[in-house]
Amino acid sequence: STASATADAEGSANMYTEFAAVVVDKDGKILADLIDTIQPKIGFDAKGEITTVTFNGTKKELRNDYNMVTYGGAIAEWFEQATTFENYIVGKTADEVNAIATVTNAEGYQVATEADADLVAGCTMAINGYQESVTKAIANAK
């Protein structure tokens, strides 16, 4: 979310960065991987000068304090869903990770389809950004 700064009130902007790291074999298949996200909040004044930066840790570091189940009605906390995704893509290539079909859910997020039942059983969060991050990490690992 964002808010414009005024003469009386600080403005704010949220930054959202997804990232991935992978270990791949000679054929580009994932041997190990991790995904995570940072969401710092930035405050700024009417001149556009940054006045505050708040960062409470990555989603994995926050663990249960991210409160995806409590406030989002999710099937599992973010770090648990991330682990499901990480485990699911082990042994896959970039093309196979990108081939995981997604559909837009009611909240507007790209989530895995029922075609990937093993993934959907433990991961109902948006995955399209992580598919992209993993693909870039694989390209960088070669």
Predicted feature locations:
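Active-site- and interface-proximal helix/loop "cap" or "latch" segments in soluble metabolic
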Residues: 1-142
